[in-house]
């Protein structure tokens, strides 16, 4: 048995200079797993709670010593002597110990860090890579694929201090034959975008996720400069490379309207969906995430009606990796894809349940980082293990982002043909 003999929590730093939670799970026999919880900037209101201390004298209230104390106390006591390979049982023990709907007693950051650390310790005990262990937990052993990266090369919204309203402008190297080639294509486009911005006298500082964050006259201008960068890199837009947006529309939804203050436009719900549709007609945008506010379900129904059979409509704040909310979306035919962020729900077991529910309903799955990240690369293993098909982990800059890409390179090298890169067919509506 992979007997747990110690659980340790500590406060570490994330990529934005804020504290986050790291956990270690130690097993009999010297096996150890270590994992860290990420943190979001644009967060859905129904996400599991990230427990912060609120003590303004430390880290402006963002300390996580309470969550760490919960790991070193109640969680450790509850898990001592348990089998680390019994992931669902461990996660349920922590969920029951917390006893709240959104994990606000122990903190989703505490529970998640321990959940992932236990999975890593169990993989070490079994003598297998983390992705292989997660695939077994998922009931899909040996069924792997390399994900198409959604590379956030131009940032706006909550991820940047500029006047661009849409939060993320991404490229997807759908024409690549392997993940390694996809990564190279993305890097070449990223460097060419820097040159394009410099030639225009625009800022080349980067945002939270490593993408450039210039001031531009409109959101369409962001697409225009990316188009030039793709062509300068020697690729065909729409053929080799497609585009994706994360609107994070909840961030500019005010009093029932969508206020694009950066370009001085205000839309009602259907009007904003029509605006997005017009962008898809001008550019090869094949995926739009959070194109409306998380509570605007009538608007989502309209957006799905006009765009859902043509492109991928991804629910992030809409679904918050929560099977209860996702099942309602499936029932009402809202969106056709889900973004998976395991700190939105707070455990590996619940994350895998959301992935299975989405796939069973014919929704696509995009595994995602958060804007506040660490060097922890667990999402790379998760994407391959579940054959999710797509991953969103930032730009080709900042080691907190590149750590995930490098782990995917290692995994592809290990698995070879057992983990195919399927490109365009992974994206809803593009097969």
UniProtKB/Swiss-Prot annotation:
Pathway: Carbohydrate degradation; glycolysis; pyruvate from D-glyceraldehyde 3-phosphate: step 4/5. Binds a second Mg(2+) ion via substrate during catalysis. InterPro entries: Enolase, Enolase-like_C_sf, Enolase-like_N, Enolase_C, Enolase_CS, Enolase_N. It is an enzyme of class 4 (lyase). (2R)-2-phosphoglycerate binds at residues 167, 341, 370-371, 392. GO terms for biological process: glycolytic process. It catalyses: (2R)-2-phosphoglycerate = phosphoenolpyruvate + H2O. Its EC number is 4.2.1.11. Mg(2+) binds at residues 246, 289, 316. CDD domains: enolase (cd03313). Catalyzes the reversible conversion of 2-phosphoglycerate (2-PG) into phosphoenolpyruvate (PEP). It is essential for the degradation of carbohydrates via glycolysis. GO terms for cellular component: cell surface; extracellular region; phosphopyruvate hydratase complex. Component of the RNA degradosome, a multiprotein complex involved in RNA processing and mRNA degradation. SMART domains: Enolase_C, Enolase_N. The lineage of its organism: Bacteria, Pseudomonadati, Pseudomonadota, Gammaproteobacteria, Alteromonadales. The keyword Ligase does not apply. Its cofactor is Mg(2+). Belongs to the enolase family. One of its GO terms (molecular function) is phosphopyruvate hydratase activity. This is Enolase. It is found in: Cytoplasm; Secreted; Cell surface. PROSITE patterns: ENOLASE.
């Amino acid at each position: 048995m992979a007997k747990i003999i110690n659980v340790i929590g500590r406060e570490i730093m994330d990529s934005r200079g804020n504290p986050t939670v790291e956990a270690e799970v130690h097993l009999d026999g010297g096996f150890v797993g270590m994992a860290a919880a990420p943190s979001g900037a644009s967060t859905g209101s129904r996400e599991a709670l990230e427990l912060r201390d609120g003590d303004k004298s430390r880290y402006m209230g963002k300390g996580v010593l309470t969550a760490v104390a919960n790991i070193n106390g109640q969680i450790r006591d509850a898990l001592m002597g348990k089998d680390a390979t019994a992931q669902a049982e461990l996660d349920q023990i922590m969920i029951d110990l917390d006893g709240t709907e959104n994990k606000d007693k122990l903190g989703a950051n505490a529970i998640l860090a321990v959940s992932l650390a236990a999975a890593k310790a169990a993989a070490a005990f079994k003598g297998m890579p983390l992705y292989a262990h997660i695939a077994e937990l998922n009931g899909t052993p040996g069924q792997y694929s390399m994900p198409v990266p959604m590379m956030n090369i131009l940032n706006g919204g909550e991820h940047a201090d500029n006047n661009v309203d849409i939060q993320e402008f991404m490229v997807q190297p759908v024409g690549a034959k392997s993940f390694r080639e996809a990564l190279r294509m993305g890097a070449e486009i990223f460097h060419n975008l820097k040159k394009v911005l410099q030639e225009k006298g625009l800022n080349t500082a980067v945002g939270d996720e490593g993408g450039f964050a210039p001031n531009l006259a409109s959101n369409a201008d962001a697409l225009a400069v990316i188009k030039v960068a793709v062509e300068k890199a020697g690729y065909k837009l729409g053929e080799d490379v497609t585009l994706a947006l994360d609107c994070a529309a909840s961030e500019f939804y005010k009093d029932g309207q969508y206020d694009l203050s950066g370009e001085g436009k205000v839309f009602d719900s259907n009007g904003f969906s029509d605006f997005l549709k017009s962008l898809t007609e001008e550019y090869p945008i094949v995926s739009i995430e959070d194109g409306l506010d998380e509570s605007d379900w009538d608007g989502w129904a309209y957006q799905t009606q006009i765009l859902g059979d043509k492109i991928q409509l991804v629910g992030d704040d809409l679904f918050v990796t929560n099977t209860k909310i996702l099942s309602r979306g499936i029932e009402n035919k809202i969106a056709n894809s889900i973004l998976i962020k395991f700190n939105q729900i707070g455990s590996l077991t619940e994350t895998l349940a959301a992935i299975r529910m989405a796939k069973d309903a014919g929704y696509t799955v995009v595994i995602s980082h958060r804007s506040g990240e660490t060097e922890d690369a667990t999402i790379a293993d998760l994407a391959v293990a579940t054959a999710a098909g797509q991953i969103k982990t930032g730009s080709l800059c900042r080691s907190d982002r590149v750590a995930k890409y490098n782990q995917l390179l290692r995994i592809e090298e290990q698995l070879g043909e057992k983990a195919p890169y399927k490109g365009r067919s992974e994206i809803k509506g593009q097969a």
